[in-house]
Amino acid sequence: MTISRFIATAAVLMLACAHACAADFRSVGAPSVVLYDAPTVKGGKRYIAPHGMPVEILARYGDWVKLRDVDGETAWAESKGLSARRNVVVKAAFARVRAAADDNAPILMTADKGVLLELVDPQVSDWVRVRHQDGIAGFVRAAEIWGI
């Protein structure tokens, strides 16, 4: 194998891995979802996840998914309680939602740590377009939120 062919093959494999390894986020779609320590209703109940809470899917086992929350806690939940709708949560002390993806754009609102925002568009560079439940939509820095 020539060096150029080796490099081309390595590049294709890295791109495939990056796609396969991309984080899979969902949000709690049911009014609430019970999270367990094992993939069965006979497992110990860890806590109740509220509607809209963003979660990262780590693994799938039948009708169950292993999840991670914003605090890094892991648990199991029935997949039927999750929604493909994407929400994010503010992880910084506060996040400024701006009119455009620019630090000099007008601030539309400030969201405190823990506030849920709907993900409107996928991440573009360092910014993400979000919407608050009050209808205010704008851009927030990706580093200030969790769930993307």
Predicted regions and their residues:
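Positively charged n-region of N-terminal signal peptides that target proteins for export
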Residues: 1-6
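Bacterial N-terminal signal peptides
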Residues: 7-18
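SH3-family beta-barrel domains
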Residues: 18-38, 45-53, 58-101, 106-116, ...
